[in-house]
Amino acid sequence: MNKQQNQQNPNNQQQRKSLFAPYLPQVSLPPLLKNGDLVSGVLRINKRNRSDAYVTTESLDADIYICGSKDRNRALEGDVVAVELLDPEKVWQTKKEKEEKKRKKEESAGIDKKKVDKKKDDVEVEGQGLLLFEDDDIVTDEHRPKYCGHVVAVMERMPGQLFSGTLALLRPSSTATKEREAAEKARREAEERAAGIEPKVDESKDDKKDEKNERPKIVWFKPTDKRVPLIAIPTEQAPPDFVENHQSYAQQLFVACIKRWPITSLHPFGTLVTQIGEIGGIDVETEALLKDNNVSAEEFNENVTKCLPPIPWTIPEKEFELRRDLRSTRIFTIDPSTAKDLDDAVSCTRLPDGNYEIGVHIADVSHFVKPNTALDRDARKRATTVYLVQKSVPMLPPLLCEELCSLCPGVEKLACSIIWKMTPEGKTMETWYGRTIIKPCAKLSYENAQEVIDGNPLNAEVKIFNDHNTKEIEADIKLLHELAQRLRDQRFKRGALSLGSIRLNFELDEQDDPIECTVYKPKDANRLIEEFMLLANMSVAQKISSAFPEQALLRRHAPPIERRLNDFVEHANRLGYDDFDATSAGALQESLNSIKDDDAREVLNLLAIKPMQRAKYFCTGTLDIAKYHHYALNFPLYTHFTSPIRRYADVLVHRMLDAALSGEKRFYLDKDAVQKTASHCNVKKEAAKNAQEQSSHLFLCVLLRNLTLQSGPVIREAIVIGVKDHAFDVLVPAFGIEKRVHLDQLPLEKFVFNDETGDLVLRWKPGVSSLEPIPDYDGFGEDDDVLLDVDEEALLADDHDDYHYLMDVTSRPSDEENRLFDANSDIGDDDDIDDDIIGDESVEINQETTKTTVPSVSIHESPKVDYNSISETTFNQSPAKISPPVIKINELPQLQIESDPDTPNSQIIRELCHLQVVITADCKKSPPVIKVLAVNPYA
């Protein structure tokens, strides 16, 4: 290590201390991994406490715990890392010793213990999403990790990874330290003057003045994602007046990237990419979340557009010779009303023998996207269309996804079709696969189809083409619905599981501002399409895995995380469901179905998602066949075939199916290339899902802010879904949000937690609104950054007051480490996604339904408040600076509460009880923060 350090710092007169171990050379990793000396996996960092990280690996039956920044060794969220295993007992003992040392350091520094606790259970981080993340990522004496390790190399990193954030002149902890020192000095001088002692004049004052006037060499970039460290940025890359006017940039969002991270530096060095705009605006926050999730929203370049066919385009004559002609077959699409990329259609033909031909017809994207072209490479790089509330970011150019490939009615289209001969009971007798030419006769929305299922006529506004009529389509919809119901019943009898995730629909005005919101509920029309898409995907999986047992791209879903599943079952037992069975997907579904109480079923359905793992793409030749299984669907083989316009994995599967039907012995990509594409699609699919959820969160925050400004505090009913000793978790059904209510933010005189019953007894301060500021809690400030830095630094070295080594711009990492941050790293230009793991297809089919007109959410008419004199900026300030309007309980709809007869002004909080909460949104933070407070029933 010392030799490498000397080589990296040849001009150093004084050897600087190495804070991290150098990475092992990439060439040395394969044999070490093969021999089991190292294991590889994907790193994730705890959102509440970035000192805790975990590596998920196929090699072990549990995650590897990475304790502290030093053992994480400069690895970032999502990196593929090589890990050397360590003795868990030794790691745990070291962790306890460091925590004790850190605690003493905090006490000596005068850091408020309450804020230390707040750092561990970060309200701001909790408020940046719609749902809570997992508590059991936090290791404790009761939940010690099974495996521990340290990162010895970063094997893969997302190329060109960007981060949104803010700029600061000084490192946040340095600023806070100087403020504390100044306050301490002022206090000491005041005491001296009171004692008649003249304070000593600082003789180095002039020197400090000169030091102050010296222009700093770096400024600090603070990413909005707390899992990413502060990044040192050269001052010349900041705005020209930043040093003099840095306070005026406090609310400006920038984008930066990491360029290098020397082993002698606590923080990485980076480059400022661009300035986005002011925090809080929908456009600015949307651009930020796209950057944070590495979503490419740039226009398609000239090399890509050159691959597109000339317009007008017609189907070549030779295709009529090679394909089955289905133009006269009654085929129609059922999609969200706003959908433009129509990539799936269905058909139903009655046969003379009483059986049916049921067809699923998918846009033949692979006809236009040829392997190893610029268009193909760009589609692979993007990997998926990203659906936001107000827009989508397409995987393919609009000419393809909205015109040539989209199955528009009345137009001849190229398709890949699967046609089953099916009995009236839904039993498949034969399956036909092949390329076809179709001419859809109608474009239906889910609402149109649902009206027919409900017994109403098809909406007269639906245009019918190709000499077909409304009655025929109505009959087809009803028959498809009946068959879908039978298929669904059979699927669940075989042991399938469906846990619907909470999704929001927004109605937007002409400026794309949210005006209404509701929780999305799937209907029979959605399930109709879902069942046939699932059947198509399963059928194709069987075909391609049979043809290419070593090269097929499939999709698997691993069983739930055992410890989390056990905790969930214990939770169900506490609620009185002693016979709750979660030994299989089918058993879990039956247990949930047996719950009669609506609240309990809704809560347990939500909590059952938390032990589940994400479904993932994989290549058959790289994994043991025992791991192919899809847990939730209970399918032995499954893939994605039905959405090639918006998923690159489906494009590859189409090519595999075509190769299988052509009788090819081997697919054109080997198993390593297929697996590399599968892994890339997994990463991009996860990023797309995160972006979609963050977009919904952003629009909900804006809606909550607007409702508050218009009508006063937003108050809704909530269900308690979990109780802790200092907090309780609630579900707010009206907005589909899950939040933690912290007791130290409520106007309580005292509270008592009963370990035996798991109940909380709150004693409220009478006449005090929950929105009035709490003296001991003044919101978020720079001290939160101090605590994060104290935590990180304590794990690295004893003395981090002097950051002179960060100024060393001569220190260079190895070429291999440099390439980790290289935006031009080849993710596969020359080489050759998960929604909630449950209801896999139903979630994806309806991604565009987030921007629709929906029934209004009832807005509680609280006492009107004159906000004309309060600017938006003032309203979003810390509660310590402005007192919101007082809420009186008698002005709200009455809600029965349970109280303790021995405690005045009391309220008992237990699981499944209902209470009123006030929901606030702070749009002056990025991402914006939602906070939920229990309403004081005695105010």
Identify the meaning behind each predicted range.
Residues 91-143, 174-215, 461-466, 770-899:
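Intrinsically disordered, low-complexity domain-flanking/linker segments in eukaryotic proteins
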